[in-house]
């Protein structure tokens, strides 16, 4: 669920305004408070824990900043992803990282994940377009309630995990459901099914 705040801001003003650990995004100058449910938090926590363990197991050069923003290159827009995976050595090249915990280069981000709440149109449309334009190589939409439009997840609607992977500058989409193992470029040996992620339980 989201709640808008009625004051237009530039991205720089937004950075000055927001407080540390606050859950806000900037959508074309509009400040939006991100409000989540308990189940949403369970799915995010489970998935981030599993990806962190996989990073350690495979000795991958990744970090998981919890409150970092991803800035759009062309608009007064900054997103606060549910899970953001960044390359450790790329952070020194990010001009806003030290001061504002903000990522501006898509090449710094091997994977970005959004867990769908009632604002599913943002995840499926606006954010997908922005992440593709930034050149982020992999984007997951975790729709554990099957809320997205039927054009995205089919009909009848059902829980679906969508993996967008960048090919020649455009996202190609794969859908995963039930006991299907999720295929990832950033985590090539990850052994998780869509069902495990939706339930937030590791049952092998």
Language model region names:
Residues 1-204:
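Gly/Pro/Ser/Thr-rich low-complexity, intrinsically disordered segments predominantly at protein N-termini
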